């Protein structure tokens, strides 16, 4: 799919559907380590279902970001996948918002700071 790294230390990723989701989450963890920490926005637009195989790397990513004091925000999650988070009570463990704009607003609250004198 696509991974974009901004100059503000934000990685935005359009996750692929299963079975590639787990591999992409592992790639994101390597990227976070290479960046010495960054905020991550995961766009689930292309994910039709999330399997238990992807939940473990997702939790590991959240833990890694916590060690750096950074955020993981997930967006564009379809109802079936939201159901997986709800049933497993993981919806309380993650920041989940409706769309990418809302996710970016959480991790880039001062995106206009380059315009400041």
Residue ranges and their predicted role:
Residues 1-30, 44-49:
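STAS-typified acidic loop motif
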Residues 29-32, 40-41, 53-55, 60-105, ...:
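Amphipathic, Lys/Arg-enriched alpha-helical "gate/interface" segment within cytosolic domains
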């Amino acid at each position: 799919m696509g991974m974009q790294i901004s100059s503000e230390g934000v990685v935005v990723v359009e996750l692929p559907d299963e079975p590639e989701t787990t591999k992409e989450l592992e790639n994101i963890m390597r990227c976070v380590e290479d960046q010495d920490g960054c905020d991550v926005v995961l766009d689930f637009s292309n994910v039709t279902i999330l399997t238990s195989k992807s939940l473990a790397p997702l939790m590991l990513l959240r833990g890694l970001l916590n060690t750096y004091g950074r955020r993981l925000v997930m967006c564009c999650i379809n109802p079936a996948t939201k159901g997986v988070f709800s049933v497993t009570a993981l919806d309380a463990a993650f920041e989940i918002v409706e769309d990418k704009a809302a996710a970016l607003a959480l991790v880039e609250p001062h995106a206009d700071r380059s315009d400041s004198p």
